[in-house]
Amino acid sequence: MSEALGDAASHFTTEAQGERGGIGRYVNVDSVTPVEFLPGLGFRPVLGQRGMANFVSFEPGTEAPRHVHEEEQIVIVVEGEFTFDLDGDVRTMRRGDVAVVPAWVPHGAWTTDSSCLEIDVFVPPRESLLKLAEAQSAEASSAAAQAAGEQEPGGQPGGA
């Protein structure tokens, strides 16, 4: 096992050190309607208070063109593979591979014969995806409120 990171009690503190950031929620990514920004490139963003996770699906033969943005991005490959260009360092990424993209660093990705599912984590949330993510969040909150009305206290479904 690797060396301990430090005092577990301070890492897992139960004492708030500031204002609560809001109310937590659960999201099933399959319930998020995918938006196709380019043919074969589907986005399913999930918005947090200070960050965003975008579940991205690439069909075979799809490209996310080389681009830059002000948000830091962490790319996590969940299944399949794609080729990733990180400022000219081009690599094939597969399940478990992670790329860290600092702000304003050129990057892009493409698939050839296979598909790929990856998660992009943006801090702060990616500006160009905010309206989409906010709409998805509102839709999910509405569905969650409706589902909560159908459950008994303790989270169990109601009914006889």
What do these predicted regions represent?
Residues 89-103:
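Short acidic-glycine-tyrosine-enriched beta hairpin
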